[in-house]
Amino acid sequence: MAEKRTGLAEDGAKSVYERLKNDRAPYETRAQNCAQYTIPSLFPKDSDNASTDYQTPWQAVGARGLNNLASKLMLALFPMQTWMRLTISEYEAKQLLSDPDGLAKVDEGLSMVERIIMNYIESNSYRVTLFEALKQLVVAGNVLLYLPEPEGSNYNPMKLYRLSSYVVQRDAFGNVLQMVTRDQIAFGALPEDIRKAVEGQGGEKKADETIDVYTHIYLDEDSGEYLRYEEVEGMEVQGSDGTYPKEACPYIPIRMVRLDGESYGRSYIEEYLGDLRSLENLQEAIVKMSMISSKVIGLVNPAGITQPRRLTKAQTGDFVTGRPEDISFLQLEKQADFTVAKAVSDAIEARLSFAFMLNSAVQRTGERVTAEEIRYVASELEDTLGGVYSILSQELQLPLVRVLLKQLQATQQIPELPKEAVEPTISTGLEAIGRGQDLDKLERCVTAWAALAPMRDDPDINLAMIKLRIANAIGIDTSGILLTEEQKQQKMAQQSMQMGMDNGAAALAQGMAAQATASPEAMAAAADSVGLQPGI
């Protein structure tokens, strides 16, 4: 038996899970309400299973918006090009400025590490789990990702826990104090020693019977690191303990919208749940009313001479005795009410289209839509999620990169990197979706500098200072781009030396030419000195 744990793990994993589950209950209820109007199967109830037939919402705006928003987040946060970079600290970079070759070699090595990390993410299908995680964040606002430690070249995918499968406790600053995950595993899939211990504790069990396995990750007060262990039927599993650095724990709890003082986050859909509910009720009323209106019912005057039996038996072109006044069709005459409901429904749908970043909401319809219009629309919609990008970059992307760096270094798939000198940075949102934004910044800076050419002869303007301020405003490091005073003087000295050499060579050539043409004998001697024969 393992020794008795202290601190946050004193009561055991299951006890902590049951205690923290009460704090999680309101967030689960809100997540179920949000899933009800979008995609109900994304966050099922505890009583649901694989055979549950979920009720489809009357409107598809929620489901379409959810998928569209998750796809846009996926492309913005995890584009196909490199979405993270490893940079050396500014102090180390300044030290290497005197050695351009050394700086280039460092950048080349860091780029290699970046490619290895990106290839590892692609080869282990991280994108599949990340897309599912983003959908959970939009609906439930919370999700937990677990990155198993790599084992050689084996396939090592990421594992996802829905909000209903884990609990988390944070301090007032949002730092994770402890987490408990619950995995339901068939008894026959457990290792033999664990099966014997479970049967000795709770009696014989069937192979297909489900067993709850709790994994407790908690912050150790003494070491400042995260400790981990697994528990089955109240017993700690031998050999399941682990230790993780505080900044590289493979269990990553993510929030969509963070609120100070709360251990869990709020979902994006929760902010627009009122519009979704209103649209659901309106669409249900409109659809049901449309079905009633589409039912064709004919009314016959009971005192008239027209007989319905003859009308139903008559073929096309037949003549039947009767009067048109005896026949009429039932009409609800609710067009005015329908118009009001349709107008309100369209207005709500337009608002939700903005919220879910649907381009059709603001992009005009036409055969020729300019690229500038598309960029403007994309910028308008991206601004809606500006804060979400910053949260996810700190709670999802940065921890993901740090964990992968630690794991790949431990398995010697990448070289050891000094933590104090190498810093992983994330580029997301409008500012830099991938590295293409760096080129755009550089092009903007060069274009702005080119516009300063007419002011070159103005004695009142300091062009060097204007160029520096333009670069700083755009966000470009001018190290190595703008020449320093020493470099300018050195360059001017080289140019002066080159001009002197060119002028001296020209003067020497003129003197030789004058001397050579002074007499035929001198011309022949000059031609012979350069390998030419006179007269050829």
From Swiss-Prot:
Pfam families referenced in this protein's UniProt entry, alphabetically: Head-tail_con
InterPro entries on file: Connector_podovirus, Portal_prot_Caudovirale
Predominant location: virion
Cellular component per GO, a single term: viral portal complex
Subunit structure: Homododecamer. Interacts with major capsid protein. Interacts with the tail tube protein gp11. Interacts with the terminase large subunit. Interacts with the internal virion protein gp14.
Protein name per the record: Portal protein
Family of the protein in this entry: Belongs to the podoviridae portal protein family.
Purpose: Forms the portal vertex of the capsid. This portal plays critical roles in head assembly, genome packaging, neck/tail attachment, and genome ejection. The portal protein multimerizes as a single ring-shaped homododecamer arranged around a central channel.
Location of the protein in the cell: Virion
GO terms for biological process, alphabetical: symbiont genome ejection through host cell envelope, short tail mechanism; viral DNA genome packaging
HAMAP family: PORTAL_PROTEIN_T7
Keywords: Capsid protein, Viral capsid assembly, Viral genome ejection through host cell envelope, Viral genome packaging, Viral penetration into host cytoplasm, Viral release from host cell, Viral short tail ejection system, Virion, Virus entry into host cell
